[in-house]
Amino acid sequence: MSRKQLALFEPTLVVQALKEAVKKLNPQAQWRNPVMFIVWIGSLLTTCISIAMASGAMPGNALFSAAISGWLWVTVLFANFAEALAEGRSKAQANSLKGVKKTAFARKLREPKYGAAADKVPADQLRKGDIVLVEAGDIIPCDGEVIEGGASVDESAITGESAPVIRESGGDFASVTGGTRILSDWLVIECSVNPGETFLDRMIAMVEGAQRRKTPNEIALTILLIALTIVFLLATATLWPFSAWGGNAVSVTVLVALLVCLIPTTIGGLLSAIGVAGMSRMLGANVIATSGRAVEAAGDVDVLLLDKTGTITLGNRQASEFIPAQGVDEKTLADAAQLASLADETPEGRSIVILAKQRFNLRERDVQSLHATFVPFTAQSRMSGINIDNRMIRKGSVDAIRRHIEANGGHFPADVDQKVDQVARQGATPLVVVEGSRVLGVIALKDIVKGGIKERFAQLRKMGIKTVMITGDNRLTAAAIAAEAGVDDFLAEATPEAKLALIRQYQAEGRLVAMTGDGTNDAPALAQADVAVAMNSGTQAAKEAGNMVDLDSNPTKLIEVVHIGKQMLMTRGSLTTFSIANDVAKYFAIIPAAFAATYPQLNALNIMRLHSPDSAILSAVIFNALIIVFLIPLALKGVSYKPLTASAMLRRNLWIYGLGGLLVPFIGIKVIDLLLTVCGLV
């Protein structure tokens, strides 16, 4: 579920951004953007020249110089406005999160158990390791782990999802977030962070982006822009002595206008806005990124590790068939399977009970009335079952049942091995049922591959991204599902160690890897991955290890995260191409206007047939300022993204933004020149 989207030009945000744009005119703020700092210096210089001309201290056209100066200041203001608007949108999103934080009191327990004596303390004084009790109606005062109890929790303030979730001690659902509300029952929580370090605090800080650090690609692009600016600065500086030597020295105002039009002011003015907007778009997808670096890395990813359950398949495996062992009838197998599943509350367990009822009219029986003992599933045993009337019935994975039989002196039958392989080859998961040391047969659990997922993987393959399915299933089942889903590779019988080793293997090959995870056992792999999306419903360890948190806890979101990252990189590249390309038109406008008096041959370059030198220079400066405003929506929304190969994407963007960057300024400058002439302003 995504949060409510802000309008691109929300009136209140625009007003606030205009105020911030004026505040950013101070030198300290401008220094952070070297390209726009040069424009700021040029604005200041031409303003001083205009005042000097108006007072008679300097010869020259004071009105023309003032017009150039005014539009240079407008250029700086527009660049400031773009950045301030992007930051304002992020801060508006952060303000909605700040509303979640409430000054409250917490019941700090003196001992780590329910019913212990408690002291009432302000929530902001809780420290890591403190134990608190929260009951129905209470706001959870800190991030932490549930050490006792279970409760229904409303996390809508954080995730935007109205459906409550269950949080309980033990397992992967013990993590709670400060600012969420208990709806029923009670929890004893151990705080896992100190004040100011909660997940909500970090979310607000990341979204506001007040101290946003530049990403590596941003730094590299900034260095390129600085280099271009220095080259054009030196080139412009050498033109004055050439014109003076020709007997008609060009004014400093014209040289400043030439410099500002030649340096890449368009991308220089929009670069920060693109980065902030990328983070904001990620939040729009209900994903919190720890930094712009994480969003950027998502755009460079070329390997996706995807969990099978919930990402590739629907995740609700259902019993589809009872396959009895040799000498066992199907009803006997179904009866034993149903008994072993009576107290199994998993979707798989309930589906076994229902299938036995549908096939053989075996009515569901109550475990307590049977005076039976239920044996729950554990990660160590990997099986569950029931002890009833001296009968010991178990169901579980093939390996687990094989070990169980051999430990009891039995032998795993060869015909059942064949049936297990048959089920696995069909893409189903085999569960083996055993009574004592006698194997009764196999239950086939069928999961459904999500509709359209194969086409999405084909698109990712076009983009050069390799998809790898991660599953705990055996190799035969994994291979069948991988073929059906259309993934490039798979890791079967996956363990945390195997995931970590696979990530390191791909990284050693120079690839960037993205993955999702929610459990403590996923933390090492999440920490190793280049893009690690932790589920908000997961453990604290997983969230701390990842560099993104999906508030919807939807593993499929990883594909959308990659799309957003690629869109940000494409937006930056496209606007850089446009910015550099449109310098060509400005060159044809200003060079003839500035130097035709000294070198008449340069009139041949006036292909736009602009009205006069003054109108040509002023038109180019006005266009240079206005194009920043026209491109703000593109910088904030991102360029149109289509899953294409790298070469096809490059060709497409060169045609649209390269050719567009060449043609648009010719049209724009000519139109502005005509308007200035018609209005008698030049």
Swiss-Prot record:
| Keywords assigned by UniProt, alphabetized | ATP-binding, Cell inner membrane, Cell membrane, Ion transport, Magnesium, Membrane, Metal-binding, Nucleotide-binding, Phosphoprotein, Potassium, Potassium transport, Translocase, Transmembrane, Transmembrane helix, Transport
Q: What is its EC number?
A: 7.2.2.6
- Give the stretches traversing the membrane: 34-54, 62-82, 219-239, 254-274, 588-608, 616-636, 656-676
Q: What is the topology of this protein in the membrane according to its UniProt annotation?
A: Multi-pass membrane protein
Question: Where, by residue number, does ATP bind?
Answer: 344, 348, 377-384, 395
Could you name the active-site residues?
307
Which Gene Ontology terms of cellular component type are present?
Answer: plasma membrane
Positions binding Mg(2+) in this chain are 518, 522
Any matching Pfam family: E1-E2_ATPase
Q: Name one GO molecular function term.
A: ATP binding
Reactions catalysed, as given in the entry: K(+)(out) + ATP + H2O = K(+)(in) + ADP + phosphate + H(+)
Q: What is its main location?
A: membrane
| PROSITE patterns reported for this sequence | ATPASE_E1_E2
- EC main class here is translocase
The reply to whether Nucleotide-binding figures as a keyword in the UniProt entry is yes
Q: Look up keyword Repeat and say if it applies.
A: no
Quote the subcellular location field of this record: Cell inner membrane
How is the quaternary structure described? The system is composed of three essential subunits: KdpA, KdpB and KdpC.
The record's section on PANTHER family has:
POTASSIUM-TRANSPORTING ATPASE ATP-BINDING SUBUNIT (PTHR43743:SF1)
Q: Which family does it belong to?
A: Belongs to the cation transport ATPase (P-type) (TC 3.A.3) family. Type IA subfamily.
- Task of the protein: Part of the high-affinity ATP-driven potassium transport (or Kdp) system, which catalyzes the hydrolysis of ATP coupled with the electrogenic transport of potassium into the cytoplasm. This subunit is responsible for energy coupling to the transport system and for the release of the potassium ions to the cytoplasm.
What is the name of this protein?
Potassium-transporting ATPase ATP-binding subunit
Q: Organism source for this protein?
A: Shigella sonnei (strain Ss046)
